[in-house]
């Protein structure tokens, strides 16, 4: 998982180059699970024998936008890993057989409007995620 990897790298490496030219939205698995439960609860309440009216494709991710660089900086900041010099770099500096889009932010309008979801920002969910990870260590 990216958070665990960056926690380790920012705690052990003096410098770290991280891609800044690809934007997306980190998604906390717990937030996704809560959204899935809300959809399933809605489905169960609507008596599916009569046909479920809210079909289609729904996108979900946390709110906000960041680059991998921004994400890593925030992880290091929250962890107090201030010794690592995190530097932005271009994605072409990390050759990959997989082509990734420069902008991969999902439109969540449909899922928010259909199910009345209040989706947390990635920065807030990252704090919760890291607190939960820390609690599991104890």
Task: Please report, for each region that a protein language model flagged, where it lies by residue.
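A hydrophobic C-terminal alpha-helical subdomain
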Residues: 93-114
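Amphipathic terminal alpha-helices
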Residues: 122-138
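Mid/C-terminal beta-alpha module of Rossmann-like enzyme folds, strongest
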Residues: 35, 42-97, 137-138
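Residue-level signal for the nucleotide or nucleotide-sugar donor/cofactor binding architecture
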Residues: 24-27, 66, 106, 117-120
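Residues that recognize and position ribonucleotide moieties
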Residues: 16, 25, 64, 87, ...
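Tryptophan-centric aromatic hotspots in well-structured domains and transmembrane helices
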Residues: 2, 68, 121-122
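NAD(P)-dependent short-chain dehydrogenase/reductase
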Residues: 1-24, 30-38
């Amino acid at each position: 998982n990216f958070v665990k990897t960056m926690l380790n790298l920012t705690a052990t490496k003096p410098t770290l180059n991280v891609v800044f030219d690809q934007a997306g939205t980190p998604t906390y698995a717990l937030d996704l699970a809560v959204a899935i439960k809300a959809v399933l609860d809605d489905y169960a309440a609507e008596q599916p024998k009569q046909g479920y009216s809210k079909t289609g494709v729904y996108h979900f991710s946390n709110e906000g936008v960041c680059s991998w660089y921004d994400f890593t900086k925030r992880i290091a900041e929250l962890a107090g890993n201030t010794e690592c010099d995190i530097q932005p770099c271009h994605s072409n500096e990390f050759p990959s057989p997989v082509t990734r889009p420069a902008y991969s932010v999902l439109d969540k309008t449909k899922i928010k409007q259909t199910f009345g979801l209040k989706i947390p920002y990635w920065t807030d969910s990252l704090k919760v995620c890291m607190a939960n990870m820390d609690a599991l260590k104890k």
